Amino acid sequence: MKSLINRPEFRQWIENSLDRQENVLAVSNQGTILHYNRDGQDLIVKTAMGRGLVRLLRHRTLLREYEAYQRMEGVQGVPACYGLVDGRYLVIEYIRGTPYRDAEWSDRDAWFDSFLRVLRDFHQRGVSHGDLKSKTNIMVTEDERPCVIDFGTAFVRKSGWRWINNWLFEH
């Protein structure tokens, strides 16, 4: 996967998709989300949008999201992160499934037990999602497993005396 995201053709695909408004999965106030599905690779590419200070702040959010994904590498129930292209496009695994609010599944108790494990796993890695009230950030995968997506509002635990950060992870 690293070889794909380091290829100039992939960066060109991203820039062409943005210029032509193709392969767009979603657009939010933060940025554009592209869907790349070729040669067995099913990926999401997140980009920051805006100009000047607004773009800078949104790019910083994207970098914080990248840091959160790095900490959660290998956690079941969190999409794999493949890195940054040119330091500005975040590439993550595309998750096939249904948003929690629209999903139906056979064993709710087992699903919620698994969901709680996912939450505990990324909290143990020093990551708090920040927006689980949005049920679109909680997915039920095609094989009925929980998956938490979109860590754009995540908090990452920092070491040292950072009273707000420490307080967030104590509560």
Where are these regions (language model features)?
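Juxta-kinase regulatory segment immediately upstream of eukaryotic protein kinase catalytic domains
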Residues: 1-24
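ATP-binding glycine-rich loop module of kinase domains
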Residues: 17-70
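Conserved structural core of kinase catalytic domains
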Residues: 58-64, 68-114
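Short, glycine/acidic-enriched loop or turn micro-motifs at the edges of active sites
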Residues: 96, 134, 153
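Short C-lobe core helix of eukaryotic-like protein kinase catalytic domains
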Residues: 114-124
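C-lobe/activation-segment region of protein kinase-like
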Residues: 141-171
